[in-house]
Amino acid sequence: MYPAHLLVLLAVCVSLLGASAIPPLPLNLVQFTYLIQCANKGSRASYHYADYGCYCGAGGSGTPVDELDRCCKIHDDCYGEAEKMGCYPKLTMYNYYCGTEGPYCNTKTDCQRYVCACDLQAAKCFARSPYNNKNYNIDTSKRCK
Protein backbone atom coordinates (compact mmCIF):
# COMPACT_ATOMS: atom_id res chain seq x y z
CA MET A 1 0.00 0.00 0.00
CA TYR A 2 1.26 3.46 -0.84
CA PRO A 3 1.97 5.95 1.98
CA ALA A 4 -0.62 8.37 0.55
CA HIS A 5 -3.31 5.68 0.80
CA LEU A 6 -2.38 5.05 4.44
CA LEU A 7 -2.71 8.75 5.21
CA VAL A 8 -6.15 8.87 3.61
CA LEU A 9 -7.24 5.75 5.51
CA LEU A 10 -5.95 7.23 8.77
CA ALA A 11 -7.78 10.51 8.11
CA VAL A 12 -11.05 8.65 7.48
CA CYS A 13 -10.67 6.63 10.69
CA VAL A 14 -9.95 9.74 12.76
CA SER A 15 -12.92 11.60 11.27
CA LEU A 16 -15.22 8.66 12.04
CA LEU A 17 -14.06 8.64 15.65
CA GLY A 18 -14.90 12.34 15.92
CA ALA A 19 -18.28 11.82 14.28
CA SER A 20 -19.25 9.22 16.87
CA ALA A 21 -19.24 11.97 19.52
CA ILE A 22 -21.76 14.11 17.62
CA PRO A 23 -25.19 13.78 19.25
CA PRO A 24 -28.06 12.66 17.01
CA LEU A 25 -30.47 15.27 15.68
CA PRO A 26 -34.01 15.26 17.01
CA LEU A 27 -35.87 12.84 14.76
CA ASN A 28 -39.40 13.76 15.70
CA LEU A 29 -38.91 17.46 14.95
CA VAL A 30 -40.28 16.85 11.46
CA GLN A 31 -43.33 15.12 12.91
CA PHE A 32 -43.90 17.99 15.34
CA THR A 33 -43.63 20.43 12.43
CA TYR A 34 -46.36 18.56 10.54
CA LEU A 35 -48.60 18.48 13.61
CA ILE A 36 -48.21 22.26 13.93
CA GLN A 37 -49.05 22.78 10.25
CA CYS A 38 -52.09 20.52 10.53
CA ALA A 39 -53.36 22.20 13.71
CA ASN A 40 -53.05 25.74 12.37
CA LYS A 41 -54.19 24.68 8.89
CA GLY A 42 -51.03 26.11 7.35
CA SER A 43 -51.73 29.66 8.52
CA ARG A 44 -48.22 30.13 9.94
CA ALA A 45 -45.02 28.30 9.05
CA SER A 46 -43.68 26.19 11.90
CA TYR A 47 -40.26 27.88 11.84
CA HIS A 48 -41.92 30.99 13.31
CA TYR A 49 -42.19 29.07 16.57
CA ALA A 50 -38.50 28.09 16.70
CA ASP A 51 -37.24 31.38 18.16
CA TYR A 52 -40.21 32.89 19.95
CA GLY A 53 -40.34 34.21 23.50
CA CYS A 54 -38.40 32.59 26.32
CA TYR A 55 -39.35 28.94 25.70
CA CYS A 56 -40.03 28.36 22.00
CA GLY A 57 -36.81 26.96 20.61
CA ALA A 58 -33.73 25.57 22.32
CA GLY A 59 -33.67 25.86 26.08
CA GLY A 60 -35.93 28.10 28.10
CA SER A 61 -35.88 30.15 31.27
CA GLY A 62 -37.74 32.84 33.14
CA THR A 63 -41.39 33.73 32.80
CA PRO A 64 -43.17 33.09 29.49
CA VAL A 65 -43.83 36.37 27.67
CA ASP A 66 -47.36 35.47 26.53
CA GLU A 67 -49.87 32.67 25.95
CA LEU A 68 -47.97 31.24 22.97
CA ASP A 69 -44.72 31.15 24.93
CA ARG A 70 -46.61 29.37 27.75
CA CYS A 71 -47.52 26.68 25.19
CA CYS A 72 -43.80 26.13 24.63
CA LYS A 73 -43.05 25.99 28.36
CA ILE A 74 -45.79 23.41 28.84
CA HIS A 75 -44.32 21.44 25.92
CA ASP A 76 -40.84 21.60 27.47
CA ASP A 77 -42.27 20.43 30.80
CA CYS A 78 -44.13 17.61 29.06
CA TYR A 79 -40.89 16.43 27.43
CA GLY A 80 -39.26 16.59 30.87
CA GLU A 81 -41.95 14.26 32.23
CA ALA A 82 -41.44 11.93 29.26
CA GLU A 83 -37.74 11.75 30.09
CA LYS A 84 -38.59 10.87 33.71
CA MET A 85 -40.62 7.95 32.32
CA GLY A 86 -37.51 6.72 30.50
CA CYS A 87 -38.58 8.04 27.09
CA TYR A 88 -36.43 10.00 24.66
CA PRO A 89 -38.93 12.56 23.36
CA LYS A 90 -36.68 14.19 20.77
CA LEU A 91 -35.87 10.80 19.26
CA THR A 92 -39.25 9.08 19.62
CA MET A 93 -41.05 8.51 16.33
CA TYR A 94 -44.82 8.09 16.44
CA ASN A 95 -47.79 7.69 14.12
CA TYR A 96 -50.13 10.63 13.63
CA TYR A 97 -52.71 11.72 11.11
CA CYS A 98 -54.05 15.04 9.92
CA GLY A 99 -57.82 14.71 9.72
CA THR A 100 -60.57 17.19 8.96
CA GLU A 101 -60.80 17.98 12.69
CA GLY A 102 -57.04 18.48 12.94
CA PRO A 103 -54.17 16.22 13.98
CA TYR A 104 -54.48 13.12 16.13
CA CYS A 105 -52.12 10.43 17.39
CA ASN A 106 -52.29 6.72 16.57
CA THR A 107 -49.37 5.05 18.33
CA LYS A 108 -48.53 1.75 20.00
CA THR A 109 -46.02 2.17 22.83
CA ASP A 110 -46.41 4.20 26.01
CA CYS A 111 -43.52 6.50 25.05
CA GLN A 112 -44.93 7.09 21.58
CA ARG A 113 -48.35 7.90 23.05
CA TYR A 114 -46.93 10.27 25.64
CA VAL A 115 -44.58 12.13 23.28
CA CYS A 116 -47.22 12.42 20.56
CA ALA A 117 -49.65 13.77 23.17
CA CYS A 118 -47.05 16.39 24.20
CA ASP A 119 -46.59 17.48 20.59
CA LEU A 120 -50.31 17.39 19.84
CA GLN A 121 -51.15 19.50 22.90
CA ALA A 122 -48.50 22.07 21.90
CA ALA A 123 -49.58 22.18 18.25
CA LYS A 124 -53.21 22.83 19.23
CA CYS A 125 -52.10 25.42 21.78
CA PHE A 126 -50.06 27.21 19.09
CA ALA A 127 -53.08 27.23 16.78
CA ARG A 128 -55.36 28.94 19.32
CA SER A 129 -52.79 31.40 20.73
CA PRO A 130 -52.17 34.85 19.25
CA TYR A 131 -48.77 35.39 17.63
CA ASN A 132 -47.05 38.64 18.59
CA ASN A 133 -44.26 39.53 16.14
CA LYS A 134 -42.57 41.58 18.88
CA ASN A 135 -41.85 38.34 20.76
CA TYR A 136 -40.01 36.72 17.86
CA ASN A 137 -36.21 36.59 18.21
CA ILE A 138 -36.16 38.56 21.47
CA ASP A 139 -33.09 39.18 23.59
CA THR A 140 -33.60 36.33 26.06
CA SER A 141 -30.75 37.53 28.29
CA LYS A 142 -32.81 40.63 29.11
CA ARG A 143 -36.41 39.44 28.95
CA CYS A 144 -36.22 35.87 30.25
CA LYS A 145 -34.96 36.18 33.81
From Swiss-Prot:
Q: Which family does it belong to?
A: Belongs to the phospholipase A2 family. Group I subfamily. D49 sub-subfamily.
Q: Which CDD domains match?
A: PLA2c (cd00125)
Q: What does this protein do, in the record's words?
A: PLA2 catalyzes the calcium-dependent hydrolysis of the 2-acyl groups in 3-sn-phosphoglycerides.
Q: Which UniProt keywords apply?
A: Calcium, Disulfide bond, Hydrolase, Lipid degradation, Lipid metabolism, Metal-binding, Secreted, Signal
**PANTHER family to which the protein is assigned, alphabetical:** PHOSPHOLIPASE A2, PHOSPHOLIPASE A2 FAMILY MEMBER
Q: Which Gene3D superfamilies match?
A: Phospholipase A2 domain
Q: What is its main location?
A: secreted
Its cellular-component GO annotations read: extracellular region
Answer yes or no on keyword Acyltransferase.
Answer: no
Q: What is this protein called?
A: Basic phospholipase A2 cPt10
